[in-house]
Design a protein with these regions (language model features):
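Surface-facing alpha-helical segments and adjacent helix-coil boundary elements at the starts of domains
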Residues: 1-253
Length: 253
């Protein structure tokens, strides 16, 4: 699967990406960029290696000042959208990794960047370090994003703080104590987007692996509030149900 995905970074991608870079960066040299990307090692690189390499090469052609980097990335996304590139585009996830690379010391600019970029390509992996370095600020922002009109931003409010996000950096503080997450999730317990509800359920399932009592208490509080809420709770308790947790089984009959 990873082998197939890495091949997404082929001629069609580079034509599309270089067109956007040419539009946004007046000094962009396509030949030099092509040589920087397609090193002797490129063909042997796996998916994650190619993405990391694209992050590094792209970063080198962006402005030095962090706020200017962010503005340029957002303009690049705009240029890609003008070509018809749709949102939640996996192959451009490498752009998100530039933000924590330079933005951990400028949390407000980074928060603004996350909100603007996460609709185009998910920030769930690149955003993890911000929870390590700025946990309180990020969790306060998650409460704001949980009420956002954009479902992609609302989803990030849940997905971004999952304690055990697969393939992502584990947020150990939330593995130890998930209570800061609960008020965020409760704001989305009746969300009208299935995309958001799935993320809330997955977050609860993460929590249940270390703190089943937290999820059980939430089920007792929210069960039968609505059909959507019941789906979130049952899907969020799936590991408990599969393992035969007595109280989870009794709650869902």
């Amino acid at each position: 699967m990873a082998d197939l995905l890495k091949n997404l970074y082929g001629d069609t991608f580079f034509k599309q990406y270089c067109t956007a870079l040419t539009t946004v960066i007046p000094s962009f040299d396509e030949d030099a960029f092509d040589k920087a990307v397609h090193t002797d090692e490129w063909e042997a690189m796996e998916l994650k290696q190619r993405m990391k390499h694209l992050t590094q090469v792209t970063d080198q052609i962006l402005p030095i000042k962090y706020t200017d980097k962010v503005a340029t990335i957002i303009d690049i996304i705009g240029a890609l959208r003008s070509q018809g590139v749709g949102d939640q585009n996996f192959i451009y996830t490498f752009l998100t990794d530039i933000i924590p690379l330079h933005g951990l010391q400028d949390i407000e600019t980074s928060i603004s960047a996350i909100e603007k970029i996460t609709s185009f390509t998910s920030f769930e992996f690149a955003g993890r370090l911000f929870f390590v370095h700025h946990p309180d600020r990020m969790m306060n922002q998650m409460k704001i994003w949980a009420r956002n009109t954009n479902p992609h931003v609302r989803r990030y409010a849940s997905e971004g703080c999952r304690p055990r996000l697969p393939w992502g950096l584990q947020l150990k503080q939330f593995v130890l104590d998930p209570n800061p997450i609960i008020p965020v999730l409760e704001l989305m317990m009746e969300d009208d987007s299935e995309y958001v509800r799935k993320s809330v359920a997955n977050n609860l399932n993460d929590i249940s692996k270390d703190h089943p009592e937290v999820v059980i208490n939430l089920i007792k509080k929210w069960k039968d509030v609505s059909k959507n809420t019941n789906w979130i709770l049952k899907h969020g308790a799936r590991t408990l149900l599969k393992s035969g947790h007595p109280e989870a089984l009794s709650l869902f009959g």
